[in-house]
């Protein structure tokens, strides 16, 4: 799971993607705090060069997962990649990159959050974010859907300051990230691939 550390040249980057970074760190803290002993390793990675062309995630995939057509050692070990990169606002669902086989799993995983508005399961494929290299390598990769309240108005702009972050929304997102990572890591099988 991951997000990116870099931002546009003129943007402070609080929402894009500081909020995703914070949510990922908090998700890891939650899992550690409750003493999770996962069957599979939960790895969080923070990318550089996302805004300039997905350089960090592409380099990682090429070095450890798949180089061209050649599948590397990590390819068989990665069950899923969860990405948070669409601003600081509350999660409302998840994009599955047209991986329809995960629908029954994700519907069940989403149930505890139904009353919070986390209800949208979309087969839409999204791009221009760090899940793309994983998806292209055949790794199940997913982007959380967020309210566009602050992201659309301030992302990639000089107004992307931390005073616009709603910490309760970021905490909400962190709990969902932790839950999805936990469920993926506790499965005896890997998540279904397309």
Sequence positions of predicted segments:
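Metal-dependent peptidase/peptidase-like ectodomains
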Residues: 9, 47-154
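His/Asp/Glu-rich mid-to-C-terminal helical/loop segments that flank catalytic regions of hydrolases
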Residues: 29, 33, 40-42, 151-194
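Alpha-helical metal-binding/catalytic segments enriched in His/Glu/Asp
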Residues: 1-55, 177
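Generic secondary-structure signature for well-ordered alpha-helical cores
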Residues: 36, 65-66, 111-115, 182-190
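Short C-terminal domain-edge/linker segments immediately following a structured domain
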Residues: 30-35, 75-79, 111-116, 172-177
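Soluble non-cytosolic domains of exported or imported proteins
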Residues: 14-22, 36, 51-55, 100-104, ...
């Amino acid at each position: 799971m991951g997000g990116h550390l870099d931002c546009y040249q003129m943007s402070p980057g609080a929402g894009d993607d500081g909020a995703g970074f914070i949510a990922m760190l908090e998700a890891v803290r939650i899992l550690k705090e409750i003493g999770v002993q996962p069957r599979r390793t939960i790895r969080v990675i923070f990318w550089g060069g996302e805004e300039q062309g997905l350089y960090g995630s592409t380099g990682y995939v090429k070095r450890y997962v798949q180089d061209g057509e050649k599948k590397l050692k990590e390819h068989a070990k990665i069950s899923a990649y969860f990405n948070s990169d669409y601003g600081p606002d509350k999660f409302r669902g998840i994009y599955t990159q047209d991986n329809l086989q995960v629908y029954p799993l994700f519907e069940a995983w989403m149930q505890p959050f139904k009353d919070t508005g986390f209800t949208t399961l979309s087969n839409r494929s999204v791009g221009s974010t760090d899940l793309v290299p994983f998806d292209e390598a055949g790794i199940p990769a997913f982007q959380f859907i967020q309210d566009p309240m602050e992201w659309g108005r301030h992302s990639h702009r000089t107004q992307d300051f931390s005073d616009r972050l709603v910490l309760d929304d970021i905490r909400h997102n962190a709990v969902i990230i932790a839950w999805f990572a936990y469920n993926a890591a506790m499965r005896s099988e890997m998540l279904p691939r397309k």
